[in-house]
């Protein structure tokens, strides 16, 4: 179910910091129209930590409504309190989410056995698929290949979003888990080599800006057309990289605001990029022709 190009959706806010529901609906429709394979609301890129529980549920509800079964919805549900994650996961299942993306517990830094028991408990509480989200740079915890091999034996643990950036580790994971266990790149810039190693797709930040192009890149990879994929990668790699010039989702929301897709609003402790980085973002957008393209489409 969760293969190909999944978009880690941003969460748009109004200037009064409230959730901008009309903008969110427009962004979701834009993704579906562009041909992405699944949607991922309320992850890191969706500023999940600064959403209230009610807002979290509302964002997922809107995503389910707007997707209308056209693409699966993989909703964020992670944390360092297993019991609370279970309750959130149950609520998301009730709302119609097709699966959950669950980041590893952070701050309390569980052992590998603790990680296994954490995900096993979540899996026992819900019937929809779980994608493990391993991002050591943010959580301080790495899900080791041996742990993922164990987790893959649990029926509804369906895959991993692997954001270690460690190609050797990803190769080991692919070699040890069943073929149907989705190994998804958590980094746009290395999605191509991850799929070449046997991975199944990406959970993408850059697809917020270029959904059709990123969907095409991933589809080319999955079809083995790496010459085409490399050309797309060459064109859009600067955008993939500039999205992380500061903490995500600061740069991507800045770019989307420049493209006329949303208001440039974050919730503290996130702040707008520095002026010099804003100019770099604008330069990349102009170099690949995105600003005028989207503004023109928005006015037609």
Label each region the model flagged.
Residues 1-7, 12-142:
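Active-site beta->alpha loop and helix N-cap motifs at the rims of alpha/beta catalytic domains
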Residues 6-12, 34-36, 45, 196-199, ...:
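C-terminal alpha-helical cap/extension of soluble enzyme domains
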Residues 21, 25-28, 145, 278, ...:
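Short, amphipathic alpha-helical "lid/cap" segments that border enzyme active or binding sites
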Residues 24, 56, 60, 85, ...:
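A general structural signal for well-ordered alpha-helical segments in protein cores
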Residues 34, 58, 62-67, 91, ...:
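Alpha-helical structural signal in soluble globular domains
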Residues 51-54, 87, 112-115, 143-145, ...:
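Short secondary-structure transition/capping segments
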Residues 124-125, 138-244:
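Catalytic alpha/beta core domains of metabolic enzymes, predominantly
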Residues 134, 156-157, 267:
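Glycine-rich phosphate-binding "P-loop"
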């Amino acid at each position: 179910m969760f293969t190909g190009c999944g978009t880690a959706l941003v969460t748009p806010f109004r200037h009064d910091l409230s959730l901008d529901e009309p903008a969110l609906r427009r962004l979701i429709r834009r993704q579906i129209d562009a041909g992405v394979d699944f949607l991922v609301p309320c992850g890191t890129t969706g500023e999940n930590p600064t959403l209230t529980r009610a807002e979290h549920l509302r964002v997922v509800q809107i995503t389910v409504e707007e997707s209308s079964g056209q693409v699966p919805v993989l909703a964020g549900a992670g944390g360092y309190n297993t019991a609370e994650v279970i309750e959130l996961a149950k609520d998301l299942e009730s709302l119609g989410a097709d699966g959950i993306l669950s980041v590893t517990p952070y701050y309390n830094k569980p052992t590998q056995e603790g990680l296994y028991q954490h995900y096993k408990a979540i899996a026992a509480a819900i019937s929809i698929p779980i994608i493990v989200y391993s991002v050591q740079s943010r959580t301080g915890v790495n899900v080791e290949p041996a742990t993922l091999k164990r987790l893959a034996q649990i029926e509804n643990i369906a895959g991993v979003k692997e954001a270690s950036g460690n190609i050797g580790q990803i190769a080991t994971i692919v070699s040890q888990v069943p073929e149907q266990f989705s190994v998804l790149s958590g980094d746009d810039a290395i999605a191509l080599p991850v799929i070449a190693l046997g991975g199944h797709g990406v959970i993408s930040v850059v697809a917020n800006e270029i959904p059709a192009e990123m969907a095409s890149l991933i589809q080319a990879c999955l079809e083995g057309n790496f010459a085409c994929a490399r050309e797309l990668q060459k064109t859009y790699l600067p955008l993939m990289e500039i999205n992380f010039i500061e903490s995500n989702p600061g740069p991507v929301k800045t770019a989307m605001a420049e493209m006329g897709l949303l208001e440039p609003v974050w919730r503290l402790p996130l702040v707008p990029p520095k002026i010099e980085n804003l100019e770099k973002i604008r330069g990349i957008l102009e170099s690949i022709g995105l600003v005028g393209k989207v503004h023109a489409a928005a006015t037609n």
